[in-house]
Each structure stands twice: as structure tokens, then as C-alpha cells.
Regions:
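Short, intrinsically disordered, mixed-charge
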Residues: 115-123, 183, 187, 228
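Short Lys/Arg-enriched alpha/beta "domain-start" segment
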Residues: 2-155
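Generic structural signal of hydrophobic/aromatic residues within well-ordered alpha-helices
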Residues: 66, 113, 117, 178, ...
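Short secondary-structure boundary segments
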Residues: 58-77, 159-180, 246-247, 298-301, ...
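Membrane-associated alpha-helical segments
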Residues: 193-311
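Juxtamembrane/interface alpha-helical elements of multi-pass membrane proteins
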Residues: 142-210
Length: 313
């Protein structure tokens, strides 16, 4: 059976979305103040890390259909992400490409929030998450900013910094989804090529091959759509320390290298399918040429026999 790239269901129309820039200055300031106050309380006299949990799903999220409580985040584009304060607990972020990031939210509450979100979006509740990842932020005013494996040390934190870290973590789990999909597709294409080599013939309809090439192109476009967020958030232009840390975070998660690897694998898959399609079309053309030659030969034979019949032979 020919492989298939799973297609994400993306019903969101960007033109219908709300840009963060559409929020009034008062709204942005109010939400930013609330987040900063929560961060101050959460980190006050704290000796442990701020825990972050990210997970991604097969479906895209229609941000305009999120349940009550979800809204734009001051330092991030509302076309891409919405956020929610979870009372007395923490903050959640939902990205349109199917990723969710929780900050200081316990497991039971995470499950409840995901169920509410998926129910509002009309998505199957039983579908499991595809990937999950944990990350931590430790605030220590006596230390300089640095990345330590799955932990970020910062001398201070605000809503802009939290948003930048959450965005990077969301991209990382989304990349894991595409890495798994592309790897599986590559294995299936190699199996198909091996079957063709052993059988010596291509028994695959051209329509199916064309469909798979289109699916691969769509998957490639989805990855590019996720990774366009690699552009540095505008708010970091005024935060030299976090700008440097943002670059370190991207390197720590290997986002650029993973993106290049996925693109290369997809291009390899598409090229392999094109070669098979061309070989199939070439073989079909050869068969058609043979059929035409045979038909011409038959027509000539009938013509000759007809002439013999006229002469009484």
C-alpha cells in the first residue's frame, strides 16, 4: 500500500483572525500587567523551576473557535496563538498548528483543559497527543542568562520573555510531529522502491503517485508555515539579553537543523515519487508504441489480404 502524509485539518482563515496589533493599547497593557504580576508572584522567593509542558496534536486549531477564556497574548501575534489564564494555577498557550504549552499547570488540569479545547473545536477527544516535551525556567537574579539542557536560567522574567520561550517550545514539539511523519513516509517509499526492484514492474496508478507528490508538497508547506515563526518576536528587539537567549534556545532545540532535515527528506521523497512516475509513464508510452505498431501491422496485413482477394488469390 502506498504511503500517505497525514493531512492536518486547517479550517482557520487568517483574514478572519484578530491580530495582536488590533488590540487597543489599554487592552495590551492590561493583559501584560496581569501576566507580569502573576510571574512576579509565581517566582517570588521561589527555589524551584517554573515548569513548562508542551504537546502537539494531529489537527490544526481554529483559534476563533476556542472556548471562553482564550484570548490574544500581548507580545505574540493572535493569528498564530491565543493564551488563557487558568485561575490560581498558571497560563496556557494554544498555537494554530496544533501545539499547546502549559506554564505551571498540573497534569489533571492540563487534561481537563485539553478536553474542553478539543470539544469546543469539534475534535475527537480520544485521539492521543502526538508528542510531548518538558522545559523549565529558573529565575535567579544573581546569575546571568543561559541555557542548560532542558532548562533556561534567567535573572528576571516578564510576559515578553515567557512568550518567546513558549513559542520556541511549541515549535519544537510541532517539529517532532513532522519528523515522525516524514520518517514514516520515507520508510514506506523505500519499501515501495524495493518492491518495484524485486518485481521488475510498476503496478501503481499514476493518479496515486500524483496524489502522494501533492501530499508531500502540502506537508512541506505546513512545516514552512510552522517555522515562519522562527522570525524573532518584535518585542525582543528592545531586550538584548533575551535576544541572545532566544538564539541560544533555537540552537538548543536545533530548530533550523531539524527544519533543513525535514525539508531534505521531503524533497527526497518527492524526487523518488517523480522518478517512479516518469518510469511508469515511460513504460506506458513504450507499451502504447508497441500497440500502435501492432495495429498498423494488422492494418497493413488486412490491406494486403484485401488486394490478394481482388486478384482472386
Amino acid at each position: 500500500m502506498l504511503f500517505m502524509f497525514p493531512r492536518k485539518n486547517n479550517s482557520q482563515t487568517l483574514n478572519e483572525s484578530v491580530h495582536t496589533s488590533d488590540m487597543s493599547f489599554h487592552q495590551r497593557s492590561k493583559i501584560a500587567t496581569e501576566v507580569n504580576e502573576w510571574l512576579h508572584l509565581a517566582c517570588q522567593d521561589r527555589l524551584s523551576d517554573l515548569g513548562m509542558h508542551a504537546e502537539t496534536y494531529k489537527e490544526d486549531f481554529d483559534l476563533d473557535r476556542l472556548p471562553t477564556g482564550w484570548g490574544p497574548y500581548p507580545s505574540l501575534d493572535a493569528n498564530d496563538v491565543r493564551a488563557k489564564f487558568i485561575s490560581d494555577v498558571g497560563i496556557a498557550f494554544a498555537w494554530r498548528f496544533g501545539a499547546i504549552v502549559f506554564v505551571e499547570v498540573p497534569k489533571e488540569t492540563r487534561h481537563r483543559e485539553v478536553d474542553l479545547l478539543r470539544e469546543s473545536l469539534g475534535l475527537p477527544l480520544r485521539d492521543p497527543r502526538v508528542t510531548a516535551e518538558k522545559f523549565f525556567i529558573f529565575i535567579d537574579s544573581a546569575r546571568s542568562a543561559q541555557v542548560e539542557y532542558n532548562r533556561l536560567v534567567l535573572p528576571s522574567i516578564n510576559q515578553e520573555r515567557l512568550g518567546a520561550v513558549a513559542q520556541t517550545l511549541a515549535q519544537s514539539v510541532a517539529m517532532e510531529y513532522y519528523e515522525a511523519v516524514v520518517t514514516q513516509a520515507k520508510v514506506q517509499v523505500l519499501a515501495m522502491l524495493d518492491r518495484i526492484r524485486r518485481q521488475g514492474r510498476i503496478a501503481i496508478p499514476a493518479m496515486r503517485l500524483n496524489s502522494q507528490i501533492a501530499d508531500a508538497s502540502m506537508a512541506q508547506a505546513e512545516v514552512v508555515g510552522v517555522l515562519h515563526l522562527l522570525d524573532k518576536p518584535d518585542t525582543l528587539w528592545n531586550d538584548a539579553e533575551m535576544e541572545s537567549i532566544y538564539l541560544d534556545l533555537r540552537n538548543a532545540f536545533d530548530l533550523e537543523e531539524r527544519f533543513k532535515s525535514i525539508e531534505y527528506k521531503i524533497e527526497t521523497i518527492k524526487e523518488s515519487l517523480r522518478i517512479v512516475l516518469e518510469a511508469r509513464n515511460s513504460a506506458l508510452a513504450q507499451r502504447l508504441e508497441i500497440i500502435i505498431i501492432v495495429l498498423v501491422g494488422v492494418e497493413v496485413m488486412f490491406s494486403i489480404f484485401g488486394r490478394f482477394h481482388l486478384f482472386g488469390w
